[in-house]
Amino acid sequence: MKNNKIYINKKILLKLSGECLKKGKKNLVDFDILNKITNEIKNLFNLGIQIGIVIGGGNLFRGSQLKIHGIKRNIGDHIGMMSTLINGLFIYNHFERLNIKSQLISPFPFNINGICESYNIFRINKILKKKIVIFCFGIGHTLFTTDSAACLKAIEIDANLLLKITNVDGVFSEDPAKNPNATLYKKISYDYALKKNLKIMDFTAFAIAKEHKLPIRIFNIKEPNSLYKAIIGKDIGTLIN
């Protein structure tokens, strides 16, 4: 793609759930899906878009769900945070194969031979001008989701838009898997989402986004060129503002 357009969103934060990387119950990381996602991100980066990614770990372990196995919540959350690092390394490796520079960032002192470094709010925007930034470990504390981390990082890097990549077409009035007649919302407010208790993000994430007027677009990564459509303002998925 040639950079001959004026883009509405020149700095974005992608929230990529771990669930988006898996296919079925056996393939915890599906490499066809990973290839598609990283290639679409590469195309945006080559257009001059600054990109931060907050990666989840739900395809491997979800801390809140480990208590049924007798694992304490705080330990489970740390296991979940380590899962985000594993997913981050997969993404980092795929960017390397595509000759795209990226940097893993940890919210606490943590280093893997220069691949991962600790977060520095004063350096992060300099890194974003040269590399794709992959935020691992959420916000680095238990009891907080990676959705909350995505909203927080989007605000800290002064992103124009938060894009939440999912396996569904957007936000529905009900679970479309249970009710095929559920309505797809094209545009809703934070207040409406909270009032209707729509299971999009947790309350903390919404509170952060609402306070800072951060627009969020939620869409299905399976749609061709979905990321490109989102940054040029196409009416894709659901917009929350």
Swiss-Prot record:
GO terms for biological process: 'de novo' CTP biosynthetic process; UDP biosynthetic process. This is Uridylate kinase. GO terms for cellular component: cytosol. Transmembrane segments: none annotated. The lineage of its organism: Bacteria, Pseudomonadati, Pseudomonadota, Gammaproteobacteria, Enterobacterales. UMP binds at G57, D77, I139, G140, H141, T142, L143, F144, T145, T146. Keywords: ATP-binding, Cytoplasm, Kinase, Nucleotide-binding, Pyrimidine biosynthesis, Transferase. Inhibited by UTP. GO terms for molecular function: ATP binding; UMP kinase activity. It comes from Wigglesworthia glossinidia brevipalpis. It catalyses: UMP + ATP = UDP + ADP.
